[in-house]
Swiss-Prot record:
Keywords, in A-Z order: Mitochondrion, Ribonucleoprotein, Ribosomal protein
Residue ranges of the region described as Disordered: 48-85, 232-277
Family designation: Belongs to the mitochondrion-specific ribosomal protein mS23 family.
Name of this chain's protein: Small ribosomal subunit protein mS23
Bias kind Acidic residues: ranges: 244-269
InterPro entries, per database record: Ribosomal_mS23_fun
GO-annotated cellular components: mitochondrial small ribosomal subunit
Gene: RSM25
Coiled coil region boundaries: none
Amino acid sequence: MGRYNLTALRVRRTALATTQCGKPGTRQPWLDVLADIPPASILVRNQAPSHPVVKQRMRTVPGKSKPQLEIKSSAGRKQTSKKPSRIFQPKEIRYEEDQLRKEFFRDHPWELARPRVVLENDGNDHRRYNWQNIQQPGKKLDGESVVQRQLYLLNNVPDMSKGAAYEIARREFYQLRLQEDVERRVAQEEALATGAYFGPDMHTVGMELENQEYEKWKVWAEGENQAMEQRLAAFTGSTGPTEESGESEDEIPLIEEEDAIGASEESETEAPSGPPI
């Protein structure tokens, strides 16, 4: 059967073979039950079911006094080219607010940098929220508030489009953000008026003073090092590298002894002989 594991289906056969071989032990009481009710053997693997996106809308129907609830489900795009090894993988679970959340954070990427509180008491905080208003008690205003407010407008306001719901939720979000900024500035001005200090802390000031002292010591150390080199040069007689050639006296190449002897012999042979005395 290839890689299928049929060990569980052959438990009764293995137990009977063990008993017939004469191994010590009593006959298991579940052998007869297993013979009457064998385990299920499903060798056909079904593909994972897809999860359609369910959308709820309120539509105005001609001839009706009240808007009618309309529920649509879309399966999404079909993936025709898929590897055989990925056919049986679980399908992605998608919700309508996923696309709304993607659009909002695409327009407001810095909202992701704000700290968020994801801790809940019992996991049912979302059931106590009423998204008729974007601001909820006990919940900090963030991008998720805009998404849930937009979804509420789409599900409960008749003939509401996604763009119009996004504009309404976004306008309310901007107004509350502006109100928070004003409250923050007013609180800072009140604190400054009562003697609060919002400058750098003690550690930052200490590090700045330490950096200044280090720079002063660095200039003093360079001067001391230069004076020490000048005193050593006065004792050794070295004047340092020349400016024209760029070579010091210690780096002047020395003439080897053999070359000097050969040069003196050549000069003696080439010199003319004078008159005898």
